[in-house]
């Protein structure tokens, strides 16, 4: 600042593992506060302009790549990712060795392509093969979606899911439109836009059941620190775990808790030389975000149920790969059938049909609502 003082603000970290940094607003003169506000506003303007340019470039490049492929549904059945996921590819195109999945947004002029997700086989340093999934640099991901199938005037039910492979499996199973939101955190903004566009459609979220988060945490600690992590029932200073490493003693805190109505694990880790614990919260993010989105839009949530949960499957694509597409169809049809019954009940209560007592109809509708909620 002009006074010589320093004021720190911003965000440190990547994605969800980020932390806001900002000085307290006390102890500053009116002139200093004004200078701080002006500096923050100017920095934000510069950032917003840089983001706008990146998104504009991404939109142009995405259109060029997408339009260079003659037809949709051109993804080869022998593509490594298609083979790995055991899917019938839909709603995407292939350019060379890369699968192109469109990132669309609703705009005043209709639907606009704003970016791409690319999926391709990559070679590691040791010569092994892996699958690389990336968003085209600068793509606007928040609120962006891909659609498998078509929404028409006759469409009554639309499914929503996180990933493209899951979307392909759901579409193959139910033959109804599927919206791909690309991430758990994007379910809510995408569903809000679709509900605004199609208020009369019934939306079902085919959620990822990320129930293995505690197992993954314990496996991560084991691989990094060679330590069998214990997760306690509640927080207690007497239950801090100490791990001896070549760099010194690492302090760990892990206990069960609740966040936004969902069970979670609170985890903290402090290494030699660190003044504070680095903290994070682990939970079934797929279910938590799906429920949050459903609450805002009166949608319903269904999670895959596995015969062998220990295999580590989380989504409906995993279910299809492990147990077959018929199992996926049966699980999803249970929710679809409940909606159809509810819709029939609603039509019977119309003014044109008064052959049934209104109170009986209301009881029937409430019964069907209960069926849907229990799925």
Please give the residue ranges for each predicted region.
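Serine endopeptidase catalytic core focused on the charge-relay Asp
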Residues: 74, 78-87, 96-99, 104
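TOPRIM fold recognition
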Residues: 156, 168-368, 372
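Short amphipathic beta-strand and strand-loop transition segments with alternating hydrophobic
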Residues: 1, 91-94
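Terminal peptide-recognition signature
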Residues: 14, 82, 101, 162, ...
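Broad, structure-driven detector of short, well-ordered beta-strand segments within folded domains
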Residues: 1, 146, 252-254
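Non-catalytic accessory segments of DNA primases and related replication-initiation nucleases
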Residues: 1-81, 210-212, 218, 344
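Conserved ATP-binding/catalytic motifs of P-loop helicase motor domains
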Residues: 375
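Phosphate-handling DNA/RNA-contact segment within nucleic-acid enzymes
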Residues: 50, 54, 99-199, 217-227
